[in-house]
């Protein structure tokens, strides 16, 4: 079964009694896998995974491609972000003191659930563990001088 099959399952990862725990949602409570319940408003969230790498598709919106005056892309290009870029729900975002242009974009993150290499496009869904909302934030002060990076 892949992520597109079966019932929708919303899981959240929290820090509970000093340990990472997976939960499901039941109203205003979160239910741990062992059945214990915690009040959602009182939990500390963790990111939905512990990534080993973060790969981002570059210029995935036509408006961005036009903004950067990039040619039509035959295949997508990508860039990497450090794993320290991952934050959790309700996490703090620190804006550098000298940052004038903080850019943010809503994204959909695909969480890859197992090692994946040379996978045929039609088999991709078998490797995706789920999806999460993501906020791609970047300090754009160096955009003109580092146009190749754009991160």
Task: Give residue ranges: language-model regions.
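N-terminal non-catalytic cap/leader segment that marks the start of a structured domain
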Residues: 1-77, 83, 148
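Glycine-enriched loop-and-adjacent helix/strand subsegments that border the catalytic/binding cleft
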Residues: 51-151
């Amino acid at each position: 079964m892949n992520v597109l099959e079966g019932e929708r399952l919303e899981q959240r990862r929290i820090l509970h009694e000093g340990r990472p725990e997976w939960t499901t949602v039941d109203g205003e409570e979160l239910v741990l896998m062992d059945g214990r319940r915690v009040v959602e408003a009182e939990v500390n969230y963790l990111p939905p995974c512990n990534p080993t790498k973060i790969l981002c598709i570059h210029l995935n919106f036509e408006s961005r491609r036009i903004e950067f005056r990039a040619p039509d892309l035959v295949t997508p290009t990508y860039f990497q972000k450090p794993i320290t870029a991952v934050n959790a729900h309700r996490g703090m975002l620190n804006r550098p003191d000298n940052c004038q242009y903080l850019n943010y974009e809503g994204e959909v993150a695909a969480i890859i659930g197992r090692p994946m290499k040379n996978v045929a496009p039609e088999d991709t869904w078998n490797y995706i563990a789920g999806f999460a909302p993501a906020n791609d934030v970047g300090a754009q002060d160096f955009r003109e001088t580092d146009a190749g990076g754009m991160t």
